Design a protein with these regions (language model features):
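The right-handed parallel beta-helix/beta-solenoid scaffold, focusing on the short coil/turn
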Residues: 3-7, 13-16, 23-32, 36-43, ...
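Residues that line or immediately flank small-molecule/substrate-binding pockets and catalytic motifs
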Residues: 85
Length: 333
């Protein structure tokens, strides 16, 4: 049997149309299954229909309009799909063994759930709608510019290799590791509850937060970008450059470098910092109920310890500016 497929389309009559890669086909009257090397190009899925792609089947340039699903699994590939479902009802669903490449979400949903084996999403862009990365999701070069990403549902590991957060909110948790992320103006990256982000940067005005159980290691913030360590969250090995900031709201900061024009502020009780290098024209603030230790303050760098704050094992180089308010405490190394 040829891999050219004929679809039945009916609305009061019957019409046959070859899916030949040249003409778009509307999937209104029935679902379609692509497998065993079958290929479909330019289909439009709507009205509750479904396009199933598996076992070496391939769907290219599918548009999912209105209420419709594109389901990819077990060796199937979907590429260059556009999901723009009415009232957020269109969906791209990538299951175990499935791969979706260069797909765009205008509205609707993307779910990637690979249990019991990997499901793969590559070079996808989400402008809106909810996105979920669940068990065994394997994602690379993902961009979110609107809507919400939740990466962490299910007990299996989730891996994201490269992400741009240009808007919207990305939540990383539940045994999910994010390697390499850039958070831009209007974007928020939250890491919590077993999630980890490695080398997440906020070069402009993005926001990166470590919440309870979340770890952020490596990365940098400049411009108006900033990090926040909430209670139970940890920032490790970050670098702050001019205009960049980090805030301790009950969480911890370790191994950080505070560069010229940058600020590290321990503001809420319970915040702590360890192994901090404050470079020329950088600032470290230690407020009431907060503590810092193993601090190196360079020439023309600034350490301010307020009433109720504590700084231990401080190395103050010649020309450093160290200010301890009444009720503050400092010990030099």
């Amino acid at each position: 049997m040829s891999n050219t497929i004929f679809m039945m389309m009916a609305a009061g009559g019957v019409a046959e149309q070859p899916i030949d890669g040249q003409t778009g086909v509307w999937l209104k009257s029935g679902d379609v299954t692509l497998s065993r090397g079958m290929k479909m190009t330019g289909a439009v899925v709507s009205s509750g229909r479904k396009q199933f792609v598996y076992s070496k089947g391939e769907a290219r340039y599918t548009q999912c309009l209105g209420v419709g699903d594109v389901l990819v699994s077990n060796g199937g590939v979907a590429s260059n799909c556009c999901i723009s479902g009415l009232s957020n009802k269109g969906r791209l669903l990538v299951y175990a063994g499935g791969t979706a490449v260069s797909c765009v979400l205008q509205s609707g949903e993307i779910h990637v759930n690979g249990y019991p084996s990997a499901a793969t999403l590559v070079d996808a862009v989400a402008h809106g709608g909810p996105v979920r990365f669940q068990n065994y999701a394997n994602v690379s070069n993902f961009t979110i510019s609107g809507g919400t990403l939740n990466a962490g549902e299910g007990g299996g590991p989730k891996r994201i290799y490269g992400m741009n957060v240009c808007g919207g909110v990305a939540n990383i948790y539940g045994n999910t590791v994010l390697s390499g992320a850039a958070v831009h103006a209007g974007g928020v990256l939250n890491v919590s509850s077993g999630g980890r982000a490695v080398n997440a940067v906020a070069p402009e005005a993005g926001i990166i937060t470590a919440r309870s159980g979340g770890i952020i290691s490596g990365g940098s913030a400049g411009g108006a970008g900033y990090y926040v360590a909430y209670s139970g969250g940890v920032l490790s090995g970050i670098a702050l450059s001019s205009g960049g900031s980090a805030f301790g709201y009950g969480g911890g900061v370790s191994g950080a470098t505070v560069g010229s024009g940058a600020r590290l502020r321990l503001t809420s009780s319970g915040s702590f910092a360890n192994d901090i290098a404050v470079e020329r024209a950088g600032y470290l603030y230690v407020s009431a109920g907060c503590g810092a230790s193993a601090i190196v303050v360079a020439s023309n760098a600034n350490l301010l310890v307020f009433s109720g704050g504590t700084a231990l094992a401080v190395t103050s180089n010649a020309g450093a500016n160290v200010t301890v308010s009444s009720g503050g405490y400092i010990e030099y190394a």
